[in-house]
Amino acid sequence: MFDKLDQLEEKYEELSRLISDPEVIADTQRWQGYVKAHAEIEEIVQVYREYKKTVKEIEDAERMLDEKLDPDFRELVQSELHDLKERREELEAKLKILLLPKDPNDEKNVIMEIRAGAGGEEAALFAGDLFRMYSKYADRMGWKVEIMDSHPTDLGGFKEVIFTIEGKGVYSRMKFESGVHRVQRVPTTESGGRIHTSTATVAVLPEAEEVEVEINPNDLRIDVFCASGAGGQHVNKTESAVRITHIPTGIVVTCQDEKSQHKNKERAMKILRARLLDKARQEQEAELASARKSQVGTGDRSERIRTYNFPQNRVTDHRIGLTLHRLDAVLEGDLDEIIDALITTDQAERLKQVDGNA
């Protein structure tokens, strides 16, 4: 581990020199590449430097204790030594996490798809609740949300809603939201006060660059038709809605929220690229699944990941056994505690795997 950290520190110093070199600064593209590489390893190098400083302070304190000291001063040094050793352990644990391989998609924007599952209109209302929850969380994080396509219902829910979230590190925090979300509550239409259970499925796809997914135009069938609103009525007379079918995989994407056919086609292609990239990623992960099954979950769309119980004001994440009795706050976008716990568990699982392979 420390050989790797020494190499990273050397690389960091070299990059620091390069980004200050007038010759490099003159070549904008090259300079930006070095700045990005420098920023990527800055945190780990700073933590490593603090670790080395702490180790030196421990050695100094131990040397002092070998000398003849008056009792009060000896006690002070021993107390400081104890704190320094605790700090060393904390920094070492942090370095191990920082050395874990980064998910190449972590810094990407995402395309999220929420679909109402079992439960009819109640499931559609729950899909709407989830969309608002994620929108509010994105707002707290300073991210931007844009609806790509939606199929609203008369009561204000969604049969399906597809939207993008753009900002710093979106995928790294949203990737564990994929799966089946379950709601337990008394519907407003229920006169007997019985609790109903409904579900909605969430898919989180990292946005795919055009260069990452090659699509042969001959593999596409593109249909245009009139857009329809809630209840199925046609909302305009022009054929602005677009349906794209990717023939080799059978993936179908429909976009109708924009008035322009060109914009709907552009959005549909963006969703198609993300779905194709996600399909390739899922196939790759299925091959690795026998070697490693993460406790946080497989990201399998059919995996029930979380229950939202309204009568008890409770939300439970089944993957990590976390229960919070503040569902109202969670639905207002207060998701950090759940997301942080999922990230911590995933890191612990990956560390265990690294230690097991060591």
UniProtKB/Swiss-Prot annotation:
<dbReference type="GO" id="GO:0016149">
    <property type="term" value="F:translation release factor activity, codon specific"/>
</dbReference>
<feature type="modified residue" description="N5-methylglutamine">
    <location>
        <position position="233"/>
    </location>
</feature>
<keyword id="KW-0963">Cytoplasm</keyword>
<dbReference type="InterPro" id="IPR004373">
    <property type="entry name" value="RF-1"/>
</dbReference>
<feature type="region of interest" description="Disordered">
    <location>
        <begin position="286"/>
        <end position="309"/>
    </location>
</feature>
<protein>
    <recommendedName>
        <fullName>Peptide chain release factor 1</fullName>
    </recommendedName>
</protein>
<comment type="function">
    <text>Peptide chain release factor 1 directs the termination of translation in response to the peptide chain termination codons UAG and UAA.</text>
</comment>
<keyword id="KW-0488">Methylation</keyword>
<dbReference type="Pfam" id="PF00472">
    <property type="entry name" value="RF-1"/>
</dbReference>
<dbReference type="InterPro" id="IPR005139">
    <property type="entry name" value="PCRF"/>
</dbReference>
<dbReference type="GO" id="GO:0005737">
    <property type="term" value="C:cytoplasm"/>
</dbReference>
<comment type="similarity">
    <text>Belongs to the prokaryotic/mitochondrial release factor family.</text>
</comment>
<keyword id="KW-0648">Protein biosynthesis</keyword>
<dbReference type="InterPro" id="IPR045853">
    <property type="entry name" value="Pep_chain_release_fac_I_sf"/>
</dbReference>
<dbReference type="InterPro" id="IPR050057">
    <property type="entry name" value="Prokaryotic/Mito_RF"/>
</dbReference>
<dbReference type="Pfam" id="PF03462">
    <property type="entry name" value="PCRF"/>
</dbReference>
<dbReference type="InterPro" id="IPR000352">
    <property type="entry name" value="Pep_chain_release_fac_I"/>
</dbReference>
